[in-house]
Structure formats: structure tokens, C-alpha cells
Amino acid sequence: MGKLAPVATIKTVPGKREEYLKHLKAHSKRYLATEPGALKFEIMVPHDQADTVMLYEVYASPEAFDAHWNGLAKKEANHDLEPLRASASAVRCNLVE
């Protein structure tokens, strides 16, 4: 199987998006620097949705994503991000190259 590209939509606690983004940016840099299978981590903010953040991530394989999801860096990120997150959903996609 090829690269895995999850696309996530996150609703932050009302009024907390900027704080969420501050933490998310710092953690995303660490993911890319320390997780060999993490290839891309893009953060997007939709127009006219003040408390929404979207993510586009690319991992070398489903196993690389699982290593990220269950890894220490993700657990540390959740410590900062979970109190600011109201909900999250994601779609796992195969990257077509």
C-alpha cells in the first residue's frame, strides 16, 4: 500500500482557535522533525468558520501513520490540544501520485 493522507476537521472550543493553532504549529514542526514517516502536515483555516481548523497530512504508509497516532509526540500534543478541542473528525485517503 502507498502513502496515507488523512484530512481532518477540528472544531475548537469557541474563541480558542488562535490558541489551538499556536500549539498545533509547534507540535506539527516536531512531528515532521522526529517522525521519519511523517511527510507533510498542513494546517488550514476555512473562511467564515471562526472555530474550525482543517489538517492535510501525508504519511509514508499506514504503518507510519499508526506510529504517529500512537507515539509520544502525539500524546504530548493531546495534552495541550484536547482542552481546546470541541470535536474532531477525519477521513483517511490514499494519496494518488
Model-inferred region functions:
Residues 10-12, 31-32, 72, 92:
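Generic helix-packing signal
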Residues 28, 61, 87-89:
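Generic serine detector
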Residues 25, 55, 87:
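Localized chelating/binding microdomains
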